[in-house]
Amino acid sequence: MNVTHVTLSPGAKTPVKLASKTGEILVKNFTNGDLLVSIEKEDFEKNYVKIPALMAEVLSECSTHSSTRSYFFDDVYLKSTAGGEVEIRCLKV
């Protein structure tokens, strides 16, 4: 299982390169503030998931799936209101 640990600064958008491409991740927010997570670099402010402090969420790239193929990603963009530790686990490799 591929696991990435990241230390975030408050308010800074941080790009994270995962060890391998995946279609699903588990993001654990160990910070004391909200965590914004996106796989969209350009449209980060429009396309993100908000994970509350000390919570976790499974995220899947389902909007680009078709009946013939799936798209995987290896870039994740994070932004925390409080800064602190975040863990990302690749679930589908």
Task: Cite the ranges covered by each PLM segment.
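Serine/proline-rich low-complexity intrinsically disordered segments, especially terminal tails, linkers
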Residues: 40, 62-65, 82
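N-terminal acidic leader/helix
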Residues: 15-26, 30, 34
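Short, surface-exposed beta-strand/strand-loop-strand elements in extracellular ectodomains
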Residues: 31-49, 88-91
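Terminal and domain-boundary regions
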Residues: 23, 85-87, 92-93
